[in-house]
Amino acid sequence: MKKFYSGVALFGISFGLVLSACGDSNESKLNPLGPELGDVSSSSISGFDDLSSSTDFLPGGSSAGIPGDGSSSSPVALSSSSALDVPGSSAQVPPASSVSTVIPRFEGNSPVFFSEVSPTNANLKDNDGNDPGWVEFYNSSDTPVDLNGYALTDDLSNPRRWVFGNVKVPAKSYMIVFLSGKNYPDYILPSDSLNMMNSDCSSESASGSLGGFNFPGMGGDWGGGMGGGMGGYPGGGSSGSNVDNLQGKSTLCFNENGAIQIGAVMKVAQGGDYSRVVVKTNNASSLSKVNQLVVRGFITKNHKIRVNFKEGESLSNWSGKNLRGTGDLSSVFYVRLDDNAKDLKRNNVTATTFATETQGSESTTIQITSYIARNRGHEPHASFKVDKDGGALYFINAEGAMLDSVRFSAVPTTASWSRDGAGKWGLATPSPYGNTIGEVFAEQVQVAEVNIPPSGFYTSAVTATFPAGTRCEQGGTEPTTNSPVVQTTVTISATTVLRCRAYAGGSYPSEEIIRTYVFEKQPSLASIFVTTDPLSMFSPDSGLYMTGNGAAMMDPKKGANFWSNRELPVYVEMFEPGKPQAPAFGVMGDYKISGQYSRAKEKKSFAVTLREEYGEKRLKYTLFPDHPELKKFKAFSLRNFGNNSGDDYVRDRLGTSMTEGLGVDYQRGRYVIVYYNGKYYGIHDLRERNNEYYYETKYGYDPNDIDLLATTSSGTDEASTGSSADYKAMLDWLQSNDLKSDANYKKIADQVDVDNYMNYMQAEMFLNNSDWPHNNMKKWRVASQKTKWKWFLYDTDFGFGVSYNTQTGNVFSYVTNRSGTSGMGIGFGGGMGGGQQTGGAISEHTILMIRLLENESFKNAFINRFCVLLSMNFSADRLLKRINDLQSQVESEMARDQEFWGYNASSMSNNLATVKSFAQSRQATIREQMESYFTLSSPAEMTLSSQGSGTILVDGLQLDKSSMTVSFYRDVPVTLTAQANSGSTFTGWSDGVTDATRKVNPGEVTSVTAVFR
């Protein structure tokens, strides 16, 4: 369920503190060098992708501080109810302590004191990109204050739990201490700042005249563009350009009040990929000493701008980072370069590019007022963490006297515990490194949800009781202070979506209450409710789900709204079958349309990503009952069945799960029914996300420690996270080195999980995926450990006999074509079938397969493994069983889905028959093609059995049955290994051989048993 905060106990009795004025309140806060420290998110509750943004962040500067009476000291208006009753105190009452705890002497009158606490931090990143709790200090004096030797603690029995090191708080300035447990005692200020602004600006656009369509045999994929040109428009947007100057400006870079600014209105053309502004550096700059970019300015709200560099004349190999707009000119955006730019060489940066990839009818406006690169330094980090459910903090000087204290209880994620200019503590909008924003509230309005029935499926009217002052909206619109006030008791008898918030004077608004009441029988499948603003999602002109006004005529309708990379906040609830009024969970997250060519389908695929700013960083729920080990998710997808939407329900689930038990990663899934704002939208395929967070869920790895490479529509291996440098270096080495020798083979086998690669390749080859390997191929490793590269199986819509599959030749030639997969190769020579074109660079899509097959041991293992898999995972019996199982899961819901979307039931039935026919006949086709390609001799059957507790491995592949008959080839020796289970011992083979690993020749050995005891 969505978390609702209760009982925010504001139980400290505070002294009223009148703080000094810290500068002219009208003073501009636009510092050309930007803020000093901290990665701050916008005070609006909009989500952020790759980095964060702030509308007010100026530590260490001379900007206005907390307003007061203008003095540099801290005069006190004493509270007669103070338990401490210490003159000059600004502290809150320490919590009751045990009799053994000695409360430090309270001294007070410190120029440095607590000004804000954020135990649930959702909008401030530390130097490592994490978001621990934090406490803010303010120095109200006219001189810096040295805190060396001072202490911070949350436990009076340990008053010097954490001690400040080299920390000086500048005059009239704020300072953050992160409560992370990392124990960084020093305050390292930013350094090595480089002004990246320049008056030399131009624009570039990439557009394709045919809307992204590729003709068969041209080597492209359905999601990419067919050509299109790069158009540069030096000095500003020209007539017909997709990058125009700001209104009233004659150039993209212009002088405003004596300072250079960058401004543009950008739009992606029909069928295009991007439009961007290119800002040259003053010289070819080195960024070797910097680890952060700081960009201040306006970006259209919820639109994304991708920042990248040109190194020399070309775009860098770094994938860049997204800035998500807030619609505020004073917003500050941060990009971390230390961990996120491993493919950036940094020593020859000639320009910065600001690109929009936002498709649709809307344009994206930017106005950059300052842009620097720097070494960000870091704030101090305490050696302890703060309890998000509440606690206390104490500030103690070197002599052991208490200077300040603050108590706090559980704080809503959207708020902090903040002190205003009059010394009053309360809930407020988080404002790290800045003045308290707006009013502070002593408490949050509480709503007894027990009186409001849960979301769900109902057949009779329900009654909900709301507290006085509750304002609600229907249909998915978010409530505001202007929304209608509802009656205390509301009766609901038809499908209704309610979004409500309780308001009361002097109190922080309640958490949002979201309910969806669907008046119909619960479906037999699990259901997902998606609640969101209806105009943002479904407005004919601007709705994210809709085509809009800027779409190309041809599929995939590039330029349509659904090609936008915008995200929308949504509330998602799930209902398991048989539990119509018991939501399994309810979470806020960001919604994004996903997919490539399939976006043009009426039913859209989408992804939901959890963000801490909405309350929860991870969904802790077993989404997939067949895989109870998967319990924590950053994100999940709901697919429309890809390019087969409206054709079948099984192809991709069947194709990706073929490797179950083989160690190849794939997206687990289940079928669900989706409702948008209470309206039925049919069957979707709930799947894991195939990004870096998959490895956190599956293996517990840090998602920031994953090198994840994707071969995408551009046809190159790009790092979606981490770095591609080592992988590309390996491919470069393979261009000039064969793997015939064991030494060279070992060099690659030390970097690549060869068994994993064989299993992956053979799955793709069996299902005959023609949208691969020039597209839809992913490989990954743990970066810090430099583990071996493994592969990820996904997006197999083009397999299992789909009508638009253009790959009709020999699949072994297809994956060994030196020029890639745009045409058919015809094998190697000398025992490997036919002659292949030679000379020139080998395609990065096929070079690994080509080189590995040069090694005799690998080639034999590859052939033998395929033989086993044709009798195991790829056998007709197993595949048909899987097809029937998948189809039976959706059977009862198919008719409604087909009627709602206008699918042809007869056509879908024929498509299912095609899938079954392929699953039964593909084994023979693979054998024919393999025999032709490798020039193999006649097959020979061999029965392999295990007796006792153990199993047999065939060239490294473990059999999953105790007895299996496999058809091998007489001229390809088979390596067998007997592997005992724990507690068991291998005693020998049935023919008297005692070596655990042995080679046998098919035809000479027809049956053998491994014996264990």
Predicted regions and their residues:
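Conserved ATP-binding subdomain of kinase catalytic cores across diverse folds
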Residues: 558-715
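Middle-to-C-terminal accessory/interaction subdomains
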Residues: 432-440, 526-528, 535-552, 559-562, ...
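Intrinsically disordered, low-complexity linkers and terminal tails enriched in Ser/Thr/Pro/Gly
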Residues: 23-33, 42-53, 57, 62-63, ...
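Disordered, low-complexity segments in secreted/periplasmic proteins that are enriched in proline
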Residues: 66-67, 205-243, 466, 547-549, ...
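Short, compositionally stereotyped local motifs that mark structural "simplifiers"
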Residues: 168-172, 177, 402, 410-569, ...
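C-terminal motif of bacterial Sec signal peptides marking the signal peptidase cleavage site
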Residues: 18-21
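Beta-rich carbohydrate-recognition modules and glycan-binding surfaces
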Residues: 189-220, 231, 235-375, 552-554
